[in-house]
From Swiss-Prot:
Zn(2+) 1 binds at residues 8, 10, 74, 193. One of its GO terms (cellular component) is cytosol. InterPro entries: Phosphatase_YcdX_put, PHP_phosphatase, Pol/His_phosphatase_N, Pol/histidinol_Pase-like. Belongs to the PHP family. Transmembrane segments: none annotated. Its cofactor is Zn(2+). It is an enzyme of class 3 (hydrolase). This is Probable phosphatase NT01CX_1282. Its EC number is 3.1.3.-. It comes from Clostridium novyi (strain NT). The keyword Metal-binding applies. Zn(2+) 2 binds at residues 16, 41, 195. Keywords: Hydrolase, Metal-binding, Zinc. Zn(2+) 3 binds at residues 74, 102, 132.
Length: 244
């Protein structure tokens, strides 16, 4: 299956990634991606960018090397109430927002607490994607999360790095989540979570799961850039962007 976008990527600005914005955009162009999202870690992650970094996205062009660039953040959920580590006046102006649970930012809790954190963050109108919800460090009630995602029109991310270098043990959880998304008709978005340009657009391990359960193409956002851009525009974002 051909995928044309990857919106979960990091640059050197995140502190533990290895390539620049231009290097990422150039690589995305070379492999034929049409949309690239830069979603740096929120400020509570050690060595993440200062909040001014996110304010200043406005200086960046919408296209680099012919690739449509989305300027966003992987915000950190900082408590079980679903609060984030970026103020609303910044979050509301980002092109795309992924909300994730990370151990340096919120202590893993019980299934009920972890689930509450995700359910609560989905009430935030500026959150677009739940990042790597299959992380075994944060066990959740996946069915509740998927049902809430459908109710709130939130995308569920399946994260390729969860099967390679991070969050070891995610395969069973992610498989269950994909099955539930298929059952309930919830859109998923594939993310590379690249911290170096060479993994951008690589969803090889995710593809094995998708093939094993015959996931409908219609529920995979990455197959058509218009699916994503239309979705974001429906939430009041990307006001400057004209969809061809």
């Amino acid at each position: 299956m051909k995928y044309v976008l990857d919106v979960h990527t990091h640059t050197v600005a995140s502190g533990h990634a290895y390539t620049t914005l231009l290097e990422n955009a150039k690589y995305a162009s070379e492999i034929g991606l049409k949309v690239l999202g830069t979603t740096e870690h929120g400020p509570k992650m050690p060595h993440a960018p200062h909040i001014w970094y996110f304010y200043n996205y406005k200086v960046l062009p919408r296209k680099i090397y012919g690739v449509t660039m989305l300027h966003g953040c992987e915000v950190n959920v900082v408590d079980y109430k679903g609060n984030l580590d970026l103020p609303e006046d910044i979050v509301k102006d980002l092109d795309i927002v992924i909300a994730s649970l990370h151990e340096p930012c919120v202590t893993p809790g019980t299934i009920e607490e972890n689930t509450a954190a995700i359910l609560n963050v989905m009430d935030n109108p500026y959150v677009d994607i739940i990042g790597h919800p299959g992380n075994p460090a944060y066990p959740i009630n996946a069915e509740e999360v998927v049902k809430k995602a459908k109710e709130k029109n939130i995308l569920i991310e399946i994260n390729n790095s969860s099967f390679k270098t991070s969050r070891i043990g995610s395969v069973p959880n992610c498989t269950e989540i994909v099955k539930l998304c298929k059952k309930h008709g919830v859109n998923i978005i594939l993310g590379s979570d690249s911290h170096v340009c060479f993994t951008i657009g690589n969803f090889d391990k995710i593809q094995e799961i998708l093939d094993s359960i015959d996931m409908p193409k219609e529920l995979i956002i990455n197959t058509d850039e218009k699916k994503l851009l239309t979705y974001l525009k429906s939430k009041g974002k990307l006001k400057d962007l004209v969809i061809d």
